[in-house]
């Protein structure tokens, strides 16, 4: 007998919705803080106990909720943020689905006190989504929500939570992203009474970066900006010399909403291409503004994923912006960076520093009990000199056209070789200090730019071979090369069918090195075979990188003084002489002042 179809109760529906909206304590924090942001808050306090499993309290000074709307706010799909279908495609707020409050309330004990500031406040208590009590009371403008006993009625959910440090890390990550997205809001986050994050809310994104990642990272960040008809981008990109082992430090924010988008991450990585070592990732924060109609945020209840109707155009704008920004800078790392980088890489954790030199916006006292316990810094917590450096850091001003042209002509100064170490590193000097150059990386960069230009030209000037080259392949590779023939022609390899599983090559580009033609052809073909599908752009790029690496001088290769001079002079003509195509540094500098400090000649 067929089972009857019945309508689910509201309580059960809310529990099902909670499975998508409220996965862990961090989900509760995210939804409630986003509500506070949408309410126009300028100060938000987040108090968490035992990684949110014991209690989560969010206090804001936003607009509050009218007394007659308080109970309605806990009904599923009840919201003040959209009214009709048209509003759904022009969402300006972080929340709009009306699912967060009922979903959170359905799996916890929840108490909310709220006031619009024009009348008495309202207090409401719920357990498992059921209203236990609602009463009027005195409260200042804003809202306080306290969530306790999370997942008390869904014990299976507790089994899938991670350790307390992991859950706390998830909460911290969410709040870091929200703080980066809203530098004009003061966030104060504490765990078990201990402050973990505090931002000033003064609108300075760089100050937020300092509070989250540390002053040393903020000092290494440079402003980026770009604009098109559809997009306006601003933010900060940290110099390539400071990088991380994962993508967690890439923050993309669209219309005030932190989002995850693989295509935009790829675009950012493309912008850093050849500037970062393989397997390393940048630290960057991008704030992107666009018309809400070209971004669909109604993809998933968590609202982390979005669909962009002009994703490719945005990606190209981001990549070009990053490339142009770094092309204007001299990216020679100093010798001291090695120690700092090593310390950073030991933990690979987000470091937080709290600046005491800026006044923090006053937090509203909504209720009789204190919000955050007063924090009195100890001597160890006293601000160091470095904590104030951001105040006096020089700002990056756009260069004039003449300055940009001069920069482009000479990216690195004239250097005079004084010797070679282990037949691998060139030591050079000038009035600015000492330079150490990786000879392989230096020539690799030079040859990469040469091959990239030659392969990109697709010149039809070919050198006929007196003796054509015949290449045989296994059947599977032969079939794949048949499909790739057009792409190979774009990089100068012209294959003609020649018997079973064979190709004949009768000519090659004139720039191929003499007596290395067959080796070059095989290496380019191997590059095409290395990936199941490859674009012409990537094939050209990978081929240029491969050829430059194989054709450059190696370590343990002795050079004469004339050889070193020629290499350094040619390197000065490169468009980006600071890293090899794999992102490793070409040059490291020790300034005269740094050397004098090391030898205690200056203090």
Swiss-Prot record:
An example Gene Ontology CC term for this record: mismatch repair complex
Basic and acidic residues composition bias: residue spans: 337-347
InterPro entries found in the cross-reference section: DNA_mismatch_repair_CS, DNA_mismatch_repair_MutL, DNA_mismatch_S5_2-like, HATPase_C_sf, MutL/Mlh/PMS, MutL/Mlh/Pms-like, MutL_C, MutL_C_dimsub
Chain positions covered by the region annotation Disordered: 337-383
An annotated Gene Ontology molecular function: ATP-dependent DNA damage sensor activity
GO BP of this protein: mismatch repair
UniProt KW DNA damage keyword: yes
A Pfam family recorded for this sequence: HATPase_c_3
Keywords annotated in UniProt: DNA damage, DNA repair
Signal peptide: none
Entry's family note: Belongs to the DNA mismatch repair MutL/HexB family.
Record's function text: This protein is involved in the repair of mismatches in DNA. It is required for dam-dependent methyl-directed DNA mismatch repair. May act as a 'molecular matchmaker', a protein that promotes the formation of a stable complex between two or more DNA-binding proteins in an ATP-dependent manner without itself being part of a final effector complex.
HAMAP family: DNA_mis_repair
NCBIfam families referenced in this protein's UniProt entry, alphabetically: mutl
PANTHER family per UniProt: DNA MISMATCH REPAIR PROTEIN MLH, PMS, MUTL, DNA MISMATCH REPAIR PROTEIN MLH1
Protein name listed in UniProt: DNA mismatch repair protein MutL
Organism for this UniProt entry: Listeria monocytogenes serotype 4b (strain F2365)
